[in-house]
Amino acid sequence: METPHSILKKFFGYDSFRPGQEQIVQRLLAGQDVLAVMPTGAGKSICYQVPALLLPGITLVVSPLVSLMKDQVGALVQAGVAAAFLNNSLTDNQKALMLHRAREGWYKIIYVAPERLEMPGFQRLVQEREISMVTVDEAHCISQWGQDFRPSYLRIRDFVASLPQRPVVGAFTATATAHVRDDIREHLALQKPYEVTTSFDRPNLYFETRRALPSQKPKELLDLVLKEGDNAGIVYCSTTKQVDETARLLQSRGIRAAAYHAKLDADTRRKNQDDFLYDRVQIMVATNAFGMGIDKPNVRFVIHYNMPKDLESYYQEAGRAGRDGQPARCTLLYSGTDVRTIRFFIEKEREADNGLPADVKAEAARKAEERLKYMTFYSTTPKCLRGFLLQYFGEAAPAKCGNCSCCLAEEQEEQLQLEYSRRRAADNARRLAEKPRRSKSTAAAGELSEFDEKLLNALYAQRKRLAGKQNVPAFVVFSDATLREMAVKKPMSIDELLNISGVGEKKAARYGNAFLRIIEDAVESR
């Protein structure tokens, strides 16, 4: 009989759950609604994917991440999970085929855009097949207090109520204040939910703020980017014009950069996003239209060229750095002009003809101004930046974290810069499978010998070849941490390979022999 732990190992290759995950899985399996607030990189998806494979019917994952659904589902399929997606990127024939297969019982997990819930074909499906669980990803989108309010999310409650039998409902988000959590509870009609908020602290992230006039920002940006070498990073700008100008600036210096914003056509956005995920470009310059749901683990820095509209947006965007747990830098460049730009957008949204009542729009504008106030406080505070963020999200914090620009004395900051430069020089992101990175996780298992590094190079190259054949990002095959563990432990059989963290049965069957050959050849030629 399958258990949560056996599913975790079989499909995802992990021996144990991260903090908070197992309790959520057990509550969902017991039929209790869940409201989980877990920071980026904490493993939210495991919390609903594992029970989805144990529950009898279909699990629906309602997500706004249309541009990423294909990759999200692709990663599940690579792990051996029967999954599909439904959104407006599919042709009519593709939608019809997907719905037919779903009615035939092909899928355990279906990702769906909220706008598709009312589609007649989808309505027929959910009336005919058992829906065991409805998962609401990025649940903060349901709240006007949230930074990504989407009116389409308000339809989810009625959709759940229309099902023949009420499924268990799980709501997941990376950032949610008390106001947002209240809205999620109310608008999804959660029934006595199990609520969990894991720590927002990301100890591996270094936070810094820099005041810079608009005329000074290009130089500040180039200084920051050039110090990063070949490391992957994201630069956020507040306007599409700023994105295009900044991308051209970086490209003019020979830096592989791409742009992403809503005014680009869908094909260009998709290509640029894929180029970043597949390591064909180093830096993505983007508006806040980019990043939600991006699961690229080796982003080493996030730079905000302009101040974001609120701390929820900032922390979620900055949190896209260092998802692999290794050191990463989050830098905010701000000026008074940024505040004026944000206020312009708030007023523009209030005056927009979007079908919402005037009083609702006025209240949304008031809440936006309140959030902007705290964002401005963060940008200018002389106190601990990490402490400011944690307290904003309702978490106790020490007076000093020792890992932000405000906590460090001038001499300490200079020393950190030197240490950071040395670390990054030794830990430069692998480009085209050239050089493996040393990291804290590597050091914890012992420094790699020269032989191990050569083997790791070969494993990276093999992963790149296999990812190219499968047309998936390299990290979907195996993570950097998994390959490092292979290089250290040198498994010589499938059974030994299954003892490596991140290697599940399905991936071992699909890729195991290809990596074992590399290890065997290296050991024999030693």
Identify what each model region corresponds to.
Residues 21-24, 375, 483:
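Short alpha-helical "packing" element that flanks the helix-turn-helix/winged-helix DNA-binding module
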